[in-house]
């Protein structure tokens, strides 16, 4: 099976070629990804939906991460990334329903990997019950609603841990409801500016909706 091929870019964002995914990560080349954050507002409090990454993932296994995300393959456009919502979550959404935030650059370093992403980032407000999601077991092992105010306090170092509520898949693939204690180290270490831009955008959208 041929390895995924990704478009690569220079520091200025100009397309410079195509490279295999493993080489892109090994060499630290800029490439495009699709990110979609699902959120909801409950009793005037914003909650964001995080996925728990599969323990066999090559980057940041077992950590809490963006609701749905994936690489854009060579020649693909941001609209093609909407497939990730269907594949990872079983959620059928049109690209036009997503709220675009633009491109946010994000650099993460892990053992043997330099991940330099140009993230086409989107928001989607959705209050679908967690039990109605059909997650991709090879990629995701659970989903958790996370309080945004508490998460900001956690990332700022004001609290050491917080409780997140959701489900984990059991060994036979059945979802089991769970309240889990999470520390900052349990979240994928996206750059501070990345999280700040996403959180600020969610708060603006929620405030605008409340004022309508």
What are these regions (language model features)?
Residues 38-40, 52, 123-125:
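Short, well-ordered beta-strand micro-motif
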Residues 1-43:
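Acidic, metal-coordinating catalytic segment for phosphate/diphosphate chemistry
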